């Protein structure tokens, strides 16, 4: 994958997250902001999830209260380079914990 393809795929991921949070109808207040290629999800309790792109590595990085994760594209899925878990699974787990209620991105 070249850099422009990586950015296109990351932009698609950012848009999917933003659209799902725009449709959020839970009790918790969850906000999403994109600034300079960094997506920040803010929760009512003040906690945040930070998602950014690492162009030199063609990775997506996820920072949560539980820790940091690095994802490589495998087929059509972003997969953690340590655990093998998918981006969506880890994002849902972190968002659910930080929101205090079930958050689904699917």
UniProtKB/Swiss-Prot annotation:
MF GO annotations: ferric iron binding; ferrous iron binding
Gene3D superfamilies: Frataxin/CyaY (3.30.920.10)
Cited SUPFAM superfamilies: Frataxin/Nqo15-like (SSF55387)
Entry GO terms, CC: cytosol
Coiled coil found in the keyword field: no
Keywords of this entry: Iron, Metal-binding
GO biological process: iron-sulfur cluster assembly
Matching Pfam families: Frataxin_Cyay
InterPro entries per UniProt: CyaY, Frataxin/CyaY, Frataxin/CyaY_sf, Frataxin_CS
Highest rank taxon of the organism: Bacteria
Function: Involved in iron-sulfur (Fe-S) cluster assembly. May act as a regulator of Fe-S biogenesis.
Stated family: Belongs to the frataxin family.
Name of the featured protein: Iron-sulfur cluster assembly protein CyaY
Gene name per UniProt: cyaY
């Amino acid at each position: 994958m070249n850099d422009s393809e990586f950015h296109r795929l990351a932009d698609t991921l950012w848009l999917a997250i933003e659209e799902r949070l725009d449709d959020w109808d839970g009790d918790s207040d969850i906000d999403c902001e994109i600034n300079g290629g960094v997506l920040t999800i803010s929760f009512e309790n003040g906690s945040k999830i930070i998602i950014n792109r690492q162009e030199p590595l063609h990775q997506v990085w996820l920072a949560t209260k539980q820790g940091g994760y690095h994802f490589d594209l495998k087929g059509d899925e972003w997969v953690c380079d340590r655990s093998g878990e998918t981006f969506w699974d880890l994002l849902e787990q972190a968002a659910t914990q930080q929101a205090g209620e079930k958050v689904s991105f699917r």
